[in-house]
Amino acid sequence: MRQIQIAVIGAGPAGIYAADILTKEYEHARVDVFDRLPAPYGLVRYGVAPDHPRIKEIIKALRRVLSRDDIRFIGNVHYGTDLTLPELRRHYDAVIFSTGARSDRALDISGIDLPGSHGAADFVSWYDGHPDVPRTWPLTAKNVAVLGAGNVALDIARMLAKPADE
């Protein structure tokens, strides 16, 4: 049987699990997983609070998938610039897009664009060391407000309540 070549754009959990399922389902499948970042794992790496070691354990499972011979991770590749869909179609039998969420949802709140107002994605990316975010953050405010009651809002509130050395 002929080998099936598949490209996955996006090396977060969805892209890596897609590669895993495809190679298990189709014996002759080979998958290249591309990401614009130098390291894989997407929001599991760059979007989970550092004090969530159990969730970060998911990286171990994803690493096992990427270590298989039939799956290859290729980082620092920008879709649309370094690779285009016509190029991918010439070399692959199928292309899967799993590019994930890059930004916050726009909030219709007065003052949201004032200096000192930051979205969760930027702050979480900063404390997780995302390569697209500056290494410094203005931690000078005496009072902050965290809008939301979901997991990310709670993570941010917890991180802000910790001493800086933690």
What is each stretch, according to the model?
Residues 30, 70-72, 116:
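Conserved beta-strand segments of alpha/beta enzyme cores
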Residues 3, 9-26, 124-166:
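Rossmann-like dinucleotide/flavin-binding elements
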Residues 26-42, 166:
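Glycine-rich FAD pyrophosphate-binding loop
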